[in-house]
């Protein structure tokens, strides 16, 4: 049937400049942030999935028959990761057994809603799910921690506790490989954060795609290391994936936000800056330090200022176990137990009146502001 040019039902003519730069057959719908390439929806799916597959194969992330836990939070990154890993596992026959592993930090109005998304993903993808909570592991929720120690320190606590919780959850499942949804933006932000803080020791390890602590049976990998956050969002949008998009209520206090803001400004000028920063981080290597001979136990070391120090053979190295909880630690007491000890001391000092009035809330706020942790 002929449709006259003036008829609104007539499809718009697609010019050569609007066609997909890969297939040259369909209209381009996506402009890739990574290289500004204009592609159609189907070609975008293909190149995005292929790039993730290439990252997995080039870095030899998985072994056939391996059981893998996806750190699932319900957010865009972990949701897309679970979807794509299941897809690629079936398409390329990786031979993996995939399990969803979620951590319940105990943040009312945030984590409870995101866990509802994870449970829907479990049904949608047909994957088993294991949920581990801070309350069960540490007898604290993040809301209780913030009430005791303040919002300024919230990400410090959560980072330490969450990392240990993932390892403990994997151990419960007898799984030795955890994959996380850290993307290229996250990796570049971590490099910037370590530079801004002058943390040279962590700078060298901040771009590793596969990590494993000495003595730990659990390794971690990041298949999205080179995937831009914007492309992950576009993939989730066009695939109509079910994910939770609300930011953690304590996230604005994190130092990472400073690095993220700097990254956005850089990306506006140079879109490739994210990958450039990652490659720069990969090229950084610490100069090897000359090894010192350790004096025998009980000997006296004379410092440069003339003072004396009695040498005691109490050094712990990576791969030792915490004396309290048995978790891997380079010290006698692991970081999590040290933080918990400080929280217990602070909790004893906080007196919360049984008052739901405005005056009671204000009094509690003033009490917490006086605490030093």
Curated annotation (Swiss-Prot):
One of its GO terms (biological process) is tRNA wobble position uridine thiolation. The gene is NCS6. One of its GO terms (molecular function) is tRNA binding. Its EC number is 2.7.7.-. It comes from the Eukaryota. It is found in: Cytoplasm. Keywords: Cytoplasm, RNA-binding, Transferase, tRNA processing, tRNA-binding. Plays a central role in 2-thiolation of mcm(5)S(2)U at tRNA wobble positions of tRNA(Lys), tRNA(Glu) and tRNA(Gln). Directly binds tRNAs and probably acts by catalyzing adenylation of tRNAs, an intermediate required for 2-thiolation. It is unclear whether it acts as a sulfurtransferase that transfers sulfur from thiocarboxylated URM1 onto the uridine of tRNAs at wobble position. Prior mcm(5) tRNA modification by the elongator complex is required for 2-thiolation. May also be involved in protein urmylation. Disulfide bonds: none annotated. GO terms for cellular component: cytosol; cytosolic tRNA wobble base thiouridylase complex; peroxisome. Its main location: cytoplasm. Pathway: tRNA modification; 5-methoxycarbonylmethyl-2-thiouridine-tRNA biosynthesis. It is an enzyme of class 2 (transferase). Belongs to the TtcA family. CTU1/NCS6/ATPBD3 subfamily. PANTHER family: ATPASES OF THE PP SUPERFAMILY-RELATED, CYTOPLASMIC TRNA 2-THIOLATION PROTEIN 1. This is Cytoplasmic tRNA 2-thiolation protein 1.
């Amino acid at each position: 049937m002929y449709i006259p040019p003036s008829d609104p039902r007539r499809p718009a003519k697609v010019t050569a400049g609007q066609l997909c730069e890969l297939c040259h057959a369909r209209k381009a719908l996506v402009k890739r942030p990574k290289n500004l390439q204009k592609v159609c929806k189907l070609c975008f799916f293909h190149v995005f999935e292929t790039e993730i597959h290439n990252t997995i194969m080039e870095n030899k992330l998985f072994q056939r028959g391996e059981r893998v836990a996806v750190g699932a939070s319900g957010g865009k990154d972990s949701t897309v990761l679970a979807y794509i890993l299941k897809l690629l596992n079936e398409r390329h026959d990786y031979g993996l057994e995939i399990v969803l592993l979620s951590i319940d930090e105990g943040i009312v109005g945030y984590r409870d809603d995101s866990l509802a998304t994870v449970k829907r993903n479990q049904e949608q993808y047909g994957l088993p799910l294991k949920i581990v909570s801070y309350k069960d592991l540490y007898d604290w929720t993040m809301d209780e921690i913030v009430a005791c120690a303040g919002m300024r320190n919230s990400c410090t606590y959560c980072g330490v506790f969450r990392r240990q919780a993932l390892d403990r959850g994997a151990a419960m499942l007898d799984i030795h490989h955890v994959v996380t949804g850290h993307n290229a933006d996250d990796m570049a932000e971590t490099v910037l954060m370590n530079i801004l803080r002058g943390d040279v020791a962590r700078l060298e390890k901040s771009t590793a795609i596969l990590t494993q602590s000495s003595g730990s049976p659990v390794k971690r990998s990041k298949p999205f290391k080179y995937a831009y956050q914007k492309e992950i969002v576009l993939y989730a949008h066009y695939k109509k994936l079910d994910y939770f998009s609300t930011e953690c209520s304590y996230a604005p206090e994190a130092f990472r936000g400073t690095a993220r803001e700097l990254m956005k400004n850089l990306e506006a000028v140079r879109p490739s800056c994210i990958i450039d920063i990652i490659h720069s981080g990969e090229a950084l290597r610490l100069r090897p330090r000359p090894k010192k001979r350790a004096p025998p136990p009980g000997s006296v070391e004379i410092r440069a200022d003339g003072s004396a120090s009695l040498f005691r053979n109490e050094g712990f190295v990576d791969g030792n176990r915490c004396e309290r909880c048995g978790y891997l630690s380079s010290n006698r007491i692991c970081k999590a137990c040290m933080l918990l000890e400080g929280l217990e001391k602070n909790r004893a000092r906080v007196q919360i009146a049984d008052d739901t009035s405005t005056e009671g809330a204000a009094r509690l706020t003033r009490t917490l502001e006086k605490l030093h942790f």
